[in-house]
Amino acid sequence: MSEQALSTFDRAREALDKKTRYVQDFPEKGVLFEDLTPVLGDAESFVAVVDAMAEAAEKLNAEIIGGLDARGFLLGSAVAYKLGLGVLAIRKKGKLPPPVVTQEYELEYGTAALELPSEGIDIAGKNIVLIDDVLATGGTLGAARKLIESCDGHVSGYVLAIEVPGLGGRDNLGDRPVIVVRDPQ
Amino acid sequence: MSEQALSTFDRAREALDKKTRYVQDFPEKGVLFEDLTPVLGDAESFVAVVDAMAEAAEKLNAEIIGGLDARGFLLGSAVAYKLGLGVLAIRKKGKLPPPVVTQEYELEYGTAALELPSEGIDIAGKNIVLIDDVLATGGTLGAARKLIESCDGHVSGYVLAIEVPGLGGRDNLGDRPVIVVRDPQ
């Protein structure tokens, strides 16, 4: 297929297929970790993935891009810039100075929490598209949605580069559209 | 001054002055924390700061943008995209799957480390501009430079949004140009 005929998503899928680094047994035995660092470090691949994710976020009527700490920052920031939007940094607990709004969530072992500043930013009534690199269990993304809704923001959808099948991730995301750049594996 | 006459840096400085959130005694007593989350969450301010940092990175002949985990990702990713470059995610210890290259550095209390993948990315001979939100002690940025040089990359300079004066940050950065968007306070 000629370069022009390739859609934005095709180019992004090619980049992900070519540059993703696969590492067995990380962070624990039995997990195949998909490291996108080489995708982002390569100009052509990085631009291709950002372009596809921006196209998806625009379809979801994004007014602000929500980036998940920390790998979601690496994609969400560029997508926000391309669309001329702000990027909402959804931080892990303790990273932001008080006062903050906090949303706890269950992990496989124990709990974690996400936070937003409770001053200086007003997301009430805004359409927020949440961006991260991978949809796995969906726990973090689900918590991010609750956090945003607790600040009267509206999550109009999720855009991810890749998805790990079989972990029930989409069940945690509620009735919002989920767009994943790479085809399910 | 009319909108057109304002330089890229003037617009960015206005955005930082207007939107930065100041919080006393965070992360510890006596520290005035400057939270840029509201700057990034506002479309106009975010674009203004990214444009200024991209202008600076271009002056420093960037071939790749190095973003420091995690707030450096929020700026470095957009700057890289604007310049059509890749973004090198310089991660905190343990976040990347092996094999990795590690650079330890001293903290006020204890040590920390930064890591890069030792496969899948080739930065040998490349001009890398390091981007973070704040220049404080310069410890993390100095370690990032050593890490990149250990992979035969070349740090052609640093671009920061703001600088905390009086912490000797520049002493840690070696003989490379440092561009800070906001005027020294």
Curated annotation (Swiss-Prot), chains A, B:
Which CDD domains does the annotation name? PRTases_typeI
Q: Which residues cross the membrane?
A: none
Q: Which GO terms describe its cellular component?
A: cytoplasm
Q: What is its EC number?
A: 2.4.2.7
Annotated protein name in UniProt = Adenine phosphoribosyltransferase
| Primary localisation category | cytoplasm
Q: Which GO terms describe its biological process?
A: adenine salvage; AMP salvage; purine ribonucleoside salvage
Top EC class, one word = transferase
Its organism's taxonomic lineage begins at: Bacteria, Bacillati, Actinomycetota, Actinomycetes, Mycobacteriales
- Task performed by this protein: Catalyzes a salvage reaction resulting in the formation of AMP, that is energically less costly than de novo synthesis.
What's in the keyword line of the UniProt record? Cytoplasm, Glycosyltransferase, Purine salvage, Transferase
According to its UniProt record, in which pathway does this protein act?
Purine metabolism; AMP biosynthesis via salvage pathway; AMP from adenine: step 1/1
Q: Does Protease count among this protein's keywords?
A: no
Q: From what organism does this protein derive?
A: Corynebacterium glutamicum (strain ATCC 13032 / DSM 20300 / JCM 1318 / BCRC 11384 / CCUG 27702 / LMG 3730 / NBRC 12168 / NCIMB 10025 / NRRL B-2784 / 534)
